[in-house]
């Protein structure tokens, strides 16, 4: 989706349209739902896909065949050089959806057992499921992202709230975790979701719950025993806390 402003190629662009450029600075509106919203305006959709994430991150133009070819060749080089088993693709749902689907298919066609997880930071399972390969939801719009895995942000949302809801009502408490799993039918492959309780973008679980070890044990037990592929953030294995504003 983006590079850093100091990347050497940004300083000497191969083509003018290698990145998305505007008369002035244009930042994304972060409205990922415009990618599939039948009522979205063209302006909102374009700004979501083409706007820069922040000023220091020039937005790559995946609709440019030269860019797409470069990204594909670069990915294959890294897989071969470092003997990689998978990629995590940042801000997957901000990309040109046609271009990123072509890139993902090219990689998985070349390496059928290679896994790619996309950061689809949304809070609705139907919207997240849209981005997984062979989605029944995206098929309604004749789209297939070819992405094997997405991150289970709704499970993360539940785990970082339920253990503080001691006086749970009908819709609070552990029912949130249960409801998350009842919606697995929306995914084409729920067993290939990436599950987590914390990562580099979120608060530390033990910071949220004030280092309550029993709550940490319960969350980790759910993570270790549910469907999906669990991801441990560095320090999770020892229950590390940390203030995100001070560098966790």
Q: PLM features: what roles do these ranges have?
A:
Residues 1-76, 81, 102-110, 120, ...:
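Substrate-binding/active-site clefts of carbohydrate-active enzymes
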Residues 12, 74-76, 80-85, 91-188, ...:
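Active-site-proximal helices and loops of the catalytic beta/alpha 8
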Residues 39, 43-48, 52, 166, ...:
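Active-site-proximal cap/lid insertion segments
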Residues 88, 117, 196, 231-234:
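A structural signal for short, well-ordered beta-strand segments and their strand-loop junctions
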Residues 206-209:
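Short, solvent-exposed helix-loop connector elements
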Residues 218:
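Conserved interdomain hinge at the start of the Helicase C-terminal
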Residues 224-236:
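C-terminal substrate/ligand-recognition segments
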């Amino acid at each position: 989706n983006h590079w850093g402003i100091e990347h050497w190629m940004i300083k000497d662009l191969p083509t003018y349209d290698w990145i998305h450029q505007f008369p002035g600075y244009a930042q994304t509106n972060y409205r990922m739902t415009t990618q599939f919203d039948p009522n979205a305006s063209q302006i909102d959709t374009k700004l979501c896909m083409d706007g820069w994430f922040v000023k220091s991150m020039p937005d790559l133009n995946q609709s440019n065949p030269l860019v797409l070819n470069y990204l594909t060749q670069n990915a294959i080089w890294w897989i071969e050089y470092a003997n990689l088993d998978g990629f995590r693709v940042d801000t997957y749902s901000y990309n040109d959806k046609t271009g990123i689907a072509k890139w993902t298919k090219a990689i998985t066609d070349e390496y059928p057992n290679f896994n790619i997880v996309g950061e689809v930071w949304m809070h609705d399972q139907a919207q997240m499921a849209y981005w997984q390969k062979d989605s029944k939801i995206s098929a309604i719009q004749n789209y297939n992202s070819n992405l094997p895995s997405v991150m289970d942000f709704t499970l993360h949302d539940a785990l970082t709230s339920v253990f503080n809801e001691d006086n749970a009502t009908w819709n609070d408490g552990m029912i949130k975790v249960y409801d998350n799993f009842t919606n697995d039918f929306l995914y084409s492959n729920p067993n290939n979701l990436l599950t987590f309780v914390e990562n580099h973008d979120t608060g530390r679980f033990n910071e949220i719950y004030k280092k309550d070890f029993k709550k940490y044990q319960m969350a980790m037990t759910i993570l270790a025993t549910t469907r999906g592929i669990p991801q441990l953030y560095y320090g999770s294995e020892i229950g590390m806390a940390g203030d995100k504003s001070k560098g966790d």
